[in-house]
Amino acid sequence: MEAIPAIGLICGVDEAGRGPLAGSVVAAAVILDPARPIDGLNDSKKLTERARERLAPLIRERAIAWAVAEASVEEIDRLNILHATMLAMQRAVAALGCVPDLVRVDGNRCPPLAVPAEAVVRGDATVPAIAAASILAKTVRDAQMIALDGEYPAYGFASHKGYPTPEHFIALRRHGVVACHRRSFAPVRELLDNPELWPAGTLT
């Protein structure tokens, strides 16, 4: 992990949920406190669920500021997933409650922001504040998908979190598209465009 630059408040930003076929895309923004370090920060995808659940409350407790925001399924379908992700990131930074001196965003592009920003490829594995943001975004989105599993128990959202797994494809073919599915994503759109693929009585 990189050391935290001594140039003021550094905000890390990352997202969770760009690839799934269902659910919102979630972004988090975190300003870490150098005086209150957190051991074990890493890209959320490299951590176990147990580790993420242990670290998330520590991040909330020790960070100078943090915020989580999202873009809805409807916004994803209207804007496309890239622009919806940028919107969620903008909302997270705006919700911090303080103005960072620099925003560092995981990936190769930044959303339009009113403060200086830079994109950091693989930043979730090299920049502590981005790693912290990735953990918050991932844990919040996972909790949302577990809640959706209670609403739509036939789809297995608690296990695959909306990603295009074989289990999810089988559920789509068997039960059809529901409100939380992203209609602009190709596998979902294919079902909508081909009613003969739907189970009887499920097309809405």
Curated annotation (Swiss-Prot):
Cofactor dependency: Mn(2+); Mg(2+)
What keywords were assigned to this record?
Answer: Cytoplasm, Endonuclease, Hydrolase, Manganese, Metal-binding, Nuclease
**Amino acids binding a divalent metal cation:** 14-15, 106
Q: Name one GO cellular component term.
A: ribonuclease H2 complex
Q: Which Pfam families match?
A: RNase_HII (PF01351)
Q: What does this protein do?
A: Endonuclease that specifically degrades the RNA of RNA-DNA hybrids.
Name of this chain's protein: Ribonuclease HII
Q: Which organism encodes this protein?
A: Aromatoleum aromaticum (strain DSM 19018 / LMG 30748 / EbN1) (Azoarcus sp. (strain EbN1))
